[in-house]
Amino acid sequence: MTTETVERTSTARSWLGVAAITASLFVFLTTELMPVGLLTPLSSSLDVPVGVAGLMVTLYGVSAGLGVPFIVAWSRRVNRRVLLSVLLSVLTVGNLVTSIAPNFPLMLATRLCMGFASGVFWAIGVSMAMRLVAPRDAGRAAATVMSGISVAAVVGIPLGIFLESRTDWRTTFLIWSGLSLLVLIAVVAAIPSLPSDNAVPVREVFALPVRNVRLRIVMVMVMLFVLGHFGAYTFVRPYLEGESSASPAFITAALMAYGAAGALGNFIGGRVVTWNPRRGFVLGSTGVAASLLLLLLAGHSPVAKVIMLVLWGTSFGVVQLCQVTLTQAAAPDTFEAAMSLNTMAYNTSIALGALFAGLFADHTGVNSVMYFGIALTTAALLVTLATARRTT
């Protein structure tokens, strides 16, 4: 076997590993956001208000956010391939338990445990992918993994709605348990041993934003944006059902359009981060705020709402990659630790966004969650503009 052949084989194996990590992101994210597409049947089946059903997203995000810096630091000596395998095992079992849970409290407890696993993955996944490939391909590997977000939006959540409409929500989670198991097998087969790298103790993790002004600003930007975006997105199905009397088929198609736009936004973001990730964040935040406002002004027109969802998805896709790049630029020597803090901020904001938006939905109507989203994403935009010199 020639040296060139060995290098090709090694390169192919590396990118198979990146693909396995991307698939992992897909199953983690779809599991986290699955209730978004199933809120109506879930709340009806379990006899809880739709806002209470949104706690499935809230508690998942709370555990993913608050637990991750501790778990990442405590597992800093654990081989990352082994750690990812354990995380996927938790996801597989958790989806299985969710599918057979006899009551809502048990389901929430299960989601809480799954959230811990999800948060740790978000902290280590991108850095794992970047380590698998040559340094010159690290950015492309990161973009590939982040594309799993768009794939999840294009296929995962709409597919969950489709499966629920053909079977029921319990069967949908059972299928996702099987899918999680397949991804676990792929990770074991495709990813080589990856000893822990660039990890620090808990005390040093929490000291990072105290010492690092750039990282602290990026975390504030991310938290405000995610609060607004996911506060609105968590209740997009009830909003479309109320405003447009949308059928499950229309909602599935609309969310697929949103997800496809997210894939486009991720592609654009991959180009923007090499130019100016801060400006990319500004453009994306502006696009999300504008799309939410125009969504409210679109009235009952289904076509107009789909167009606004496409703008929303594209803008979100741009922001996603830009915020990861800004985090890396703020703390290049402690990226995994910084990403654990980013994950804490991100997922806690998902949880709080879903919680506050749920309160608005239950007390002032579903339309109010769109105003909530506009206010918070605009705040993220203003912070980014006001701190331009410190985030470049």
What are these regions (language model features)?
Residues 94-97, 105-114, 303-311:
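Paired small-residue
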Residues 67-80, 265-277, 361-362:
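Helix-to-loop junctions at the C-terminal end of transmembrane segments
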Residues 104-106, 134-191, 239:
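Helix-loop-helix hairpin linking two adjacent transmembrane segments in secondary transporters
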